UniProtKB/Swiss-Prot annotation:
Chain positions found as Phosphoserine: 582
Keyword Phosphoprotein: yes
Compartment annotation: Cytoplasm, Cytoskeleton, Cilium basal body; Cell projection, Cilium; Cytoplasm, Cytoskeleton, Microtubule organizing center, Centrosome, Centriole
Claim: DNA-binding is one of the keywords in the record: no
Annotated gene: ARMC9
Coiled coil (residue ranges): 201-235
GO CC annotations on file: centriole; ciliary basal body; ciliary tip; cilium; cytoplasm
Protein name per its UniProtKB record: LisH domain-containing protein ARMC9
């Protein structure tokens, strides 16, 4: 009862607010009258209406101060009402604040009638200078803002070419629009009554918790089976080891007594200790009587730490699967695409995963060989956001494996569909990420590189990378890596030469980006395109060497060495030997054709099964079990001896997953 009394005023206020919102006018009058008779106080500031009116007033005051050039009023309101976590932690807020300081610093120069008041102008410039030396110093290494640090020291910024953009008529309205959008996002005005909000959040929370617990149960059961298999294997190995140890102790005792150990006995002990894969092949081919052989082979057998005896997954009825992928409900399609992807991503690398992939390919799961109008590939253009995303994820999983890329490359329409989806997809970030990831992995293959260059993908990438802060880390990293792979080809360099100034500006800006994972790809792209004389001339004209030397002062040792190579390339007069490769030779280069199954493929799943609903492997083996037709296939063996030193810029096609994992490049 005490708790109710403590919150009675607020609870009654919630009821009053909802009755007012739902227009129960008579009920509200009766309710208010009875509260007054009983002496029950009503909270007057409950819900969103009061907060909304206050937030709208703050937004209006900020915009007014912006329009009037009232610097102190604006930043007092800014610091009071914009959370410090946003001001200090959000990159967009930091960039916006920087440009707002520029706006107030040049306000008198732009809008004064006649000559601006010198004292007032000096005060504004001094305020801006103080900002640059304190909070604004954090952005001093960003190429975008570097020229503005000279603004307080330029006698007449209006005529200086570096600041020409600031004094254009469109600059201030565009900045004001960004400010208004930012403020609307921060304050999030809402007229929804608090009682309704509490009800909806509570109901949704319970539903999400139930689904989450169900999913956790499914995952726990799957992990439990995996751990049980591992435990049984470890226990068997332990018992085997104890048995061998006991025999060795007996043998040592026999040796002390003068009995000799036979080569056959030594061989039998060693074979029992070797991993399963080596036992049969070594049993008859190794001479264990030679001193040192047994111990050397034992140590070698420990090198590849692999799970043993991984069973093959059950075969599936692919005809029924493909039929339901084309004709089933959107929810069924999504669960099937998810389950098929999980088969690839969660299977054990080696024979199990190879068998899964080979079954998909031999049954033409994605209809790459089909010419029918209705095919599984068409799911990439589904009206359902979930189906489109899950189809893109599955294609990305295929593209993560060398044999999968070879399968997808057989049909040029796959590439064209992915390129189209990349440029059209504006609703779902994860769909776009997976399409981009697949295309980036496609760029490991020379024929696909050629097709992407001819389709003008370089121009699209450069345009997207002009504003990297709007991109997710995955999109940024894979976009830059794809651009680098295409720039390694002579046709790609020639494409870049058509917009040399723009490409150089975008790449030089990216060198200073806070995401350091992209630096090797940016360096590789710059180094490659600077082998073209016309691009070198453009780079020299824009002072590229000075820009690069700025990064040397702040970069790490690896980045510094790469930039030194780029500067050397920039100042060269002739093409280095072997830089420009012929585009006529479309032979595959398997050195870089690795399997790269990154964890991002299964992140942020959109759908969860309801109670009693099948998903994952259980869905496949319950509804789509087929006749056992699994057959293994030998992997293609590529060269694996070309390593990247890290000192020089990348000069071979790579993909971020493989590059991070240290695969040869």
């Amino acid at each position: 009862m005490g708790d109710i009394l403590a919150h009675e005023s607020e609870l009654l206020g919630l009821v009053k607010e909802y009755l007012d919102f739902a227009e129960f006018e008579d009920t509200l009058k009766t309710f208010s009258k009875e509260c007054k008779i009983k002496g029950k106080p009503l909270c007057k500031t409950v819900g969103g209406s009061f907060r909304d009116s206050k937030s709208l007033t703050i937004q209006k005051d900020l915009v007014t101060a912006f329009d009037n050039g009232d610097q102190k009023v604006f930043f007092n309101l800014w610091e009071e009402h914009i959370p410090s976590s946003v001001r200090d932690g959000d990159s967009f807020a930091q960039r916006l604040e920087f440009y707002l300081h520029i706006h107030f610093a040049i306000y008198l120069l732009k809008y004064s009638v006649g000559r601006p008041d010198k004292e007032e102008l000096d005060e504004k410039i001094s305020y801006f200078k103080t900002y640059l030396e304190t909070k604004g110093a954090a952005l001093s290494q960003t190429t975008e803002f570097l020229p503005f640090y000279a603004l307080p020291f330029v006698p007449n910024p209006m005529v200086h070419p570096s600041f020409k953009e600031l004094f254009q008529d469109s600059w201030t309205p565009e900045l004001k629009m960004k400010l208004e959008k930012f403020l609307a996002l921060i304050f999030k005005a809402s007229n929804t009554p608090k009682l309704l909000t509490i009800y909806k959040e509570n109901g949704q929370s319970n539903k999400e918790m139930l689904q989450q617990l169900h999913q956790q149960l499914v995952e726990a059961e799957r992990r439990s089976m995996t751990y049980l298999k591992r435990y049984n294997k470890i226990q068997a190995d332990y018992h085997n080891l104890i048995g061998v140890t006991a025999e060795l102790v007996d043998s040592l005792e026999a040796t002390v007594s003068g009995k000799m150990i036979t080569p056959e006995y030594l061989q039998s002990v060693c074979v029992r200790l070797f991993s399963n894969q080596m036992r049969q092949s070594l049993a008859h081919s190794v001479d264990f009587t030679r001193p040192g052989t047994a111990s050397t082979m034992l140590r070698a057998s420990l090198a590849p730490v692999k799970l043993k005896d991984v069973p093959l997954l059950p075969s599936l009825d692919y005809e029924k699967l493909k039929k339901d992928l084309i004709l089933g409900s959107d929810r069924l399609k999504a669960f099937l695409l998810q389950a098929l992807r999980w088969r690839l991503t969660t299977s054990h690398p080696g024979e199990q995963r190879e068998t899964v992939l080979q079954a998909y390919i031999s049954n033409d799961l994605l209809d790459c060989y089909s010419h029918n109008q209705r095919s599984v590939l068409q799911l990439l253009h589904s009206k359902s956001d979930v189906v489109r995303q899950y189809m893109a994820r599955l294609i990305n999983a295929f593209a993560s494996l060398a044999e999968g890329r070879l399968y997808l490359a057989q049909n040029t329409k796959v590439l064209r569909m992915l390129e189209g989806r990349l440029k059209e997809e504006d609703k779902d970030i994860i769909t776009r990420e997976n399409v981009l990831g697949a295309l980036q992995k496609f760029s490991l293959r020379r024929p696909l590189q050629t097709a992407m260059i001819q389709d003008g993908l370089i121009f699209w990438l450069v345009d997207v990378l002009k504003d990297p802060d709007c991109l997710s880390d995955y999109t940024l990293e894979y976009s830059v890596a794809l651009l680098m792979n295409l720039c390694l080809r002579s046709t790609g360099k020639n494409m870049c030469a058509k917009v040399a100034g723009l490409v150089l500006k975008v790449l030089s800006d990216l060198l200073g980006h806070e995401n350091h994972e992209i630096q090797p790809y940016v360096s590789g792209a710059l180094y490659s395109i600077l082998s073209v004389p016309s691009i070198r001339e453009e780079a020299r004209a824009m002072g590229m060497e000075d820009i690069l030397r700025c990064f040397i002062k702040e970069g790490n040792a690896e980045m510094i060495r790469q930039i030194e190579f780029i500067i050397k390339q920039l100042n060269s007069e002739e093409l280095p030997d072997g830089v420009l490769e012929s585009d006529d030779d479309e032979d595959e280069d398997d050195e870089e054709d690795h399997d790269i199954m990154e964890a991002d493929l299964d992140k942020d799943e959109l759908i969860q099964p309801q109670l009693g609903e099948l998903s994952g492997e259980k869905l496949l083996t319950t509804e789509y079990l087929g006749i056992m037709t699994n057959t293994g296939k030998m992997r293609r063996k590529g060269l694996a001896n070309v390593q990247w030193s890290g000192d020089e810029p990348l000069q071979r096609p790579v993909t971020p997953g493989g590059h991070r994992n240290g695969y040869p490049v």
